[in-house]
Amino acid sequence: YKQQGLAARATYSWNDRYFFEANLGYNGSENFSPEKRFGFFPAFGLGWAISNEAWWESLQETVSYFKVRYTDGLVGTDAVTGRRFMYLDQMASVDGYRFGDQNNGVGGWGFSKYGANVGWSTSRKQDLGVDLKFFKDNLSLTLDIFKEHRKDIFITRRVIPDYSGFVEMPYANLGVVDNKGFEATLEYTQQLGKKCFLTVRGNFSWNEDKIIENDDPRVQYPWMEKRGTNVNGRWGWIAEGLFTSEEEIMDHAKQFGEGHPGQISKVGDIKYKDLNGDGVIDDYDKCLIGQGDVPKIYYGFGADLQLGDFSVGALFAGNAKADRCLGGNA
């Protein structure tokens, strides 16, 4: 689909101490109706190199560089599952009515997708950072704290019941998600000889997102509420262990269609928790059981040894605060 945009940028630096940058974007997409086609997305950044101030000179031997920076900006997206012309209804041929006993029918056309007068999904991003260098730039530290507020996220309507007759639920700008976190990088370089240098470094980052609005209808039990949880959270039943006897199976809630032919729990099967106490394990007993497979924490460390034109290095990386759902036979 077609897009059109204008962009402008202005930068200013005074005496390598004070910095300012502004970015302006005006973008349009044919995905949206004419009255919502264009969006304005500004951003700006400020910086202050404190170590370049005259009164900092006495500290240069210890803190050779100190800069504080802040950025704040708005970005937008028009990506709605790859569909063009979101604001227009789409029609397709459908099965017609049947008449008599000869399977005669009259074909017709019906709605396959409903138009939605959606607009740009926007995200406000803020970042506060500090750059530090110590001992004649041998040791450097970078810290960033960030926050993001996404709103008007494209989601299909969920409060509309199935019996309303919609073939497909329409899209709307209703989703809201918050994200926050921080990043840190530390690096140290030491000269070991005339042409020999050793550098060691490490990094750490943490982020956490939270669903603010997802258009879900009111839930029957509090553990079913997805607002306030992370986007990639894993939902399911709580495993209490394994069945150890037939008596335990008989005393436990019925699981997954028990009572029907071929549906019965056996000794050694997983026993799930009946959260609402109704004697049946079903969707009303599902809750948040995991953080999902997108890590909240990333970390790494490494080292480089340079001797003349020859260098060798090593890097170790890892992540945490994530889980995987393993399937298959044990």
Regions found by a protein language model. Name each.
Residues 101-111, 149-174, 209-294, 302, ...:
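Surface-exposed, extracytoplasmic segments of Gram-negative outer-membrane nutrient-acquisition systems
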